[in-house]
Amino acid sequence: ELSIHANVDGRLADFEEGDFWEFVGDDNMPLRLEDGSVLCDPGHALEFVGLAYKFLRAARNAEVDALTLERLSCAAAPLPTILQQIFRLGFQPHPGGICKAYDMVGRRPLHTDMPWWSLPETIRSAALCWQESDDADVRQSCLGIWRDCHNAFVENYLRPEIHLMAIQTLTIEGTVSPAIPATADADPGYHTGLSLLDVIDLFRD
């Protein structure tokens, strides 16, 4: 259930609305590490929003009854808040990228490397949220997230001098990190830019 991994409707007073944590304990509460921190992987959380919207769209296109449609609507309701909150926490505007880990207790980045893949994933999440929402403020926020991720990817990761091949990971200082994240050859079924193909399909619709 989404509310186990996210703070929805103020369920946990110690966390902000839309906070999303990576791990839960046996008590279905956020898992605290030895130092008391609660880990959020902003890239995973933002990726989840896009995949959730993709599932919800597919489910609505199937022949489902009214009760199922109502449940789908309830499931979708927290997604814009999660998108906006996690982007606000994880996106590092200077130089531009999404940090690998964030502490939900200390409210600070835990791992400041910024892998490439979280930016196109967040573009898909913002695009689908923009399409699904009827709220003007949410839609405007989605466009801003979409813009910031696009600009960060094009300006900081793509390298025109070598046929637009992208840097895999940047540090928060804007230098190239030796860390290797998910790559197309190691993960051929997913991390190959498929999220951007969904965005292209959105334009076609």
Q: Which functions belong to the PLM regions below?
A:
Residues 1-205:
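Glycan-recognition and catalytic cores of secretory/periplasmic carbohydrate-active enzymes
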